[in-house]
Amino acid sequence: MKLDVIKLDGGKAGDIELSEDLFGLEPRADILHRVVRWQRNNAQAGTHKVKTRSETSYSTKKIYRQKGTGGARHGDRNAPIFRKGGIYKGPTPRSHGHDLTKKFRKLGLRHALSAKAKAGELVVIENAEAEGKTAALAKQVANLGWKRALVIDGAAVNEGFARAAKNIEGLDILPSMGANVYDILKRDTLVLTKSAVEALEARLK
């Protein structure tokens, strides 16, 4: 498939042939869902913790004698039945991550790129270079109509562009190796540089 290549000032800079294997697939929601779930679960801290009966510090004294009171039998006030007592089978720190094969992760990335291409939310620019002035880049981004955009560059992100984009709300920048399904789907517009297209095609072929 062919797509126009533009400059940051909005001018045309030719066109580019995109691989059908990367940008021409029929997007599958089940594949995208599995990869996003894998990403988010691996990112989850899993630090939730409550105290069990052995960890609470209240009292270890038996609250009253075993027999003769007419009440139920009880030990100390650390029991889960009492206020300030320990929690029975509560959450403990653990990893929420699970495995997903490299082959499937690559497939998910191809489907994410294809989803953006099919939705008309894919833009290819000649390069992502700037002098480091936020105001100038913000004006260009506004003129291009990018409200929530992810810019993916080649192997390395241009320092001036990264510095200029740092304070622009809704604009994220990643090198080609940082391209991932969650960040691609999270933004309304996916912007690829020509070097990013080449790097992604080499990575996902």
Swiss-Prot record:
Gene Ontology MF: a single term: rRNA binding
Cysteines joined through disulfide linkages: none
Pfam families recorded: Ribosomal_L4
CC terms in the record's Gene Ontology section: ribonucleoprotein complex; ribosome
Keyword vocabulary terms for this entry: Ribonucleoprotein, Ribosomal protein, RNA-binding, rRNA-binding
BP-aspect Gene Ontology terms: translation
Quaternary assembly: Part of the 50S ribosomal subunit.
Family: Belongs to the universal ribosomal protein uL4 family.
PANTHER family: 50S RIBOSOMAL PROTEIN L4 (PTHR10746), LARGE RIBOSOMAL SUBUNIT PROTEIN UL4M (PTHR10746:SF6)
Function: One of the primary rRNA binding proteins, this protein initially binds near the 5'-end of the 23S rRNA. It is important during the early stages of 50S assembly. It makes multiple contacts with different domains of the 23S rRNA in the assembled 50S subunit and ribosome.
Name the record gives this protein: Large ribosomal subunit protein uL4
